């Protein structure tokens, strides 16, 4: 019995983009911090991380200094006493003389006669990393003049969520030094490539356009539709990934308002006059919350032949079987990595979205309400789970995953991605991350579904005797899915009851039967379709059966097809394989191969265990 129906082969594409890890590769132990402020007009270069000192007008006074800083006017810092060493000023200069009426930090006093600062000897416990009371620090942080340590004020409700410009944040997020709030850079655009049989484009000015091996000349602004794409036309477009959000309906929630604002929830408006943590419990019908999905960091491991790293402090480092001793801040380059050096980096994946059409929208209504779905207004009278047929589209997040370990060629248990779609009704178990194959009782085998798919192109004419140029045709398999195969290419089934109706002159072979004209002709020993499948693959995934993914073209690379050797068939030295179009002359088949064949060719029928052309 033969039946037909059509299902859809989905195209799964995943993108991976990661933000670089924070590191200093050119800094030294005394680099300045752009988030700090420095006295005497000194600032910090945000790129070079070095202090920029304004032109001096006269020498500086001798408050506790930092040997890591530079000072104007030839002034230097004594590393032991932590006092400034000032060159003798000119007789006419008095700009840096101290004032006995002023007070100075760290118990420094002003000599009323000489008008110079008198600095007490530093304690034995002081070090070059103690803070400086003469400096100012962000976030109301102060320096204890006695202990020389930073004192951080207790955060109030209005400042508990302020960020720190001196800190680094994942995912490319940075801290605004003025507002002390986090801001996220716009996502980087990604390039998407697809192969189509026709497309429409707008040309705003005169130009020439090449598509499907033809050149089109446009002389004025025109909307152009291209339908002639033999072999498919490749389109490339740029897209910006959308922020990934999650929407949920809750009966109560808590939120923090950092500044005065108004908030509407559950049909009520709340006025906030100051920084407040607000708890909303009155949500008749449910309050809708939208949250951003923050991807977790992933660890990426790679093996390299050489690498460069920065060591900010004395340490020991082992690489390539050798141990290196670092005695000071150093940028180190390794070129000796016999067998490769393994580097481990942490990165934040960028989230992208994929849109899918759904036929049913399901939601839970905790109490009586009305809901509008796909232009339908539904009245709910009691708490219920509601399922509504829809034609709208929903958007779900697709987060990249780390690469899975390779599995043996005979194993189907390599890790899959639940966000991807797979051909032939195959799905991915979200918990076990393994592929779930449909029952072979009512469908062709998963292997047959995968290996017989080839890129769909418009039907072409041309099957020359002895040189079988494939004519791509569409067949319907057991009401499961539609695949496209070349004229003369085999389509395998597990039993004769699964043989489909074939709309063109394409032989259908039954597994285990004598499906060649000559019974001595051996079957292929591996996959009969050695070309790649039409859906894009992921180089980070592993595939069974020795199949790999081309990192550039994103297409599957199948191992070469091999055919059992034999001496001759029907007197043909070296033999031929009818599963390979062009390898057998027309005399090999039951009937002569027509010189031309199109999509309207005669219908194939099955007789016994062999296919013949009607």
UniProtKB/Swiss-Prot annotation:
InterPro entries: Sed1/Spi1. Residues 1-18 form the signal peptide. One of its GO terms (biological process) is fungal-type cell wall organization. GO terms for cellular component: fungal-type cell wall. Disulfide bonds: none annotated. One of its GO terms (molecular function) is structural constituent of cell wall. Keywords: Glycoprotein, Signal. Transmembrane segments: none annotated. Glycans are attached at residues 24, 107, 140, 213, 518, 529. Probable self-resistance protein; part of the gene cluster that mediates the biosynthesis of enfumafungin, a glycosylated fernene-type triterpenoid with potent antifungal activity, mediated by its interaction with beta-1,3-glucan synthase and the fungal cell wall. Does not encode any steps in enfumafungin biosynthesis, but because it is related to a fungal cell wall structural proteins, it might play a role in self-resistance toward enfumafungin. Belongs to the SED1 family. This is Probable self-resistance protein efuJ. It comes from Hormonema carpetanum.
């Amino acid at each position: 019995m033969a039946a037909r129906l059509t299902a859809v082969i989905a195209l799964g594409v995943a993108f991976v983009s990661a933000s670089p890890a924070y590191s200093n590769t050119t800094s030294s132990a005394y680099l300045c911090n752009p988030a700090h402020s420095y006295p005497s007009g000194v600032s910090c270069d945000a790129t070079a991380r070095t202090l920029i000192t304004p032109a001096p007008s006269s020498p500086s006074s001798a408050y506790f200094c930092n040997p890591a800083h530079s000072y104007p006017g030839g002034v230097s810092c004594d590393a032991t006493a932590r006092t400034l060493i000032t060159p003798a000023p000119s007789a006419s200069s008095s700009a840096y003389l101290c004032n006995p009426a002023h007070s100075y930090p760290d118990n420094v006093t002003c000599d009323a006669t000489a008008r110079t600062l008198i600095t007490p000897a530093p304690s034995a416990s002081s070090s070059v990393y103690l803070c400086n009371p003469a400096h100012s620090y962000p976030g109301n942080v102060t320096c204890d003049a006695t202990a020389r340590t930073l004192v951080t004020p207790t955060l109030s409700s209005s400042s508990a969520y302020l960020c720190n410009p001196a800190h680094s944040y994942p995912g490319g997020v940075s801290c605004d030094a003025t507002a002390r709030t986090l801001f996220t850079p716009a996502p980087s655009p990604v390039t998407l490539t697809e192969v189509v049989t026709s497309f429409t484009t707008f040309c705003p000015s005169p130009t020439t356009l090449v598509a499907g091996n033809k050149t089109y000349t446009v002389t004025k602004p025109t909307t152009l539709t291209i339908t002639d794409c033999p072999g498919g036309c490749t389109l490339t477009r740029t897209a910006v990934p959308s922020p990934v959000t999650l929407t949920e309906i809750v009966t109560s929630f808590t939120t923090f308002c950092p500044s005065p604002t108004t908030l509407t929830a559950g049909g009520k408006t709340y006025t906030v006059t100051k920084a407040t943590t607000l708890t909303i419990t009155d949500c008749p019908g449910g309050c809708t919350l939208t949250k951003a999905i923050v991807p977790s960091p992933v660890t990426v491991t790679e093996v390299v032949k050489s690498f460069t790293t920065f060591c900010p402090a004395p340490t020991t480092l082992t690489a390539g079987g050798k141990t290196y001793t670092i005695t000071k801040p150093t940028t180190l380059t390794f070129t000796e990595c016999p067998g490769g050096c393994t580097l481990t980096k942490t990165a934040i994946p960028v989230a992208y979205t994929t849109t899918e059409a759904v036929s049913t929208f399901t939601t839970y209504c905790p109490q009586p309400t009305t809901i509008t779905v796909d232009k339908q207004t539904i009245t709910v009278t009691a708490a219920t789970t509601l399922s509504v047929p829809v034609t709208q589209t929903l958007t779900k997040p697709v987060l990249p995953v780390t690469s899975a370990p390779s599995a043996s060629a005979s194993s189907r248990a390599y890790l899959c991605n639940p966000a991807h779609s797979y051909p032939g009704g195959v799905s991915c178990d979200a918990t076990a991350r393994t592929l779930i194959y449909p029952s072979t009782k009512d469908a062709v085998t998963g292997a047959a579904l995968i290996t017989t798919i080839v890129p769909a192109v418009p039907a072409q004419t041309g099957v020359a005797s002895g040189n079988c140029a494939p004519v791509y045709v569409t067949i319907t398999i057991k009401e499961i899915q539609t695949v496209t195969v070349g004229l003369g290419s085999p389509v395998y089934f597990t039993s004769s009851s699964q043989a489909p109706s074939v709309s063109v002159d394409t032989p259908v072979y039954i597994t285990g039967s004598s499906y060649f004209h000559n019974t001595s002709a051996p079957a292929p020993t591996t996959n009969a379709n050695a070309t790649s499948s039409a859906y894009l693959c992921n180089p980070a995934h592993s595939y069974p059966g020795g199949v790999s993914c081309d990192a550039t073209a994103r297409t599957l690379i199948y191992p070469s097809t091999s055919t059992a050797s034999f001496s001759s068939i029907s007197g043909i030295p070296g033999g031929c394989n009818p599963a390979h179009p062009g390898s057998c002359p027309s005399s090999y088949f039951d009937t002569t191969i027509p010189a031309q064949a199109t999509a309207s060719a005669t219908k194939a029928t099955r007789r016994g265990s062999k296919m013949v052309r009607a």
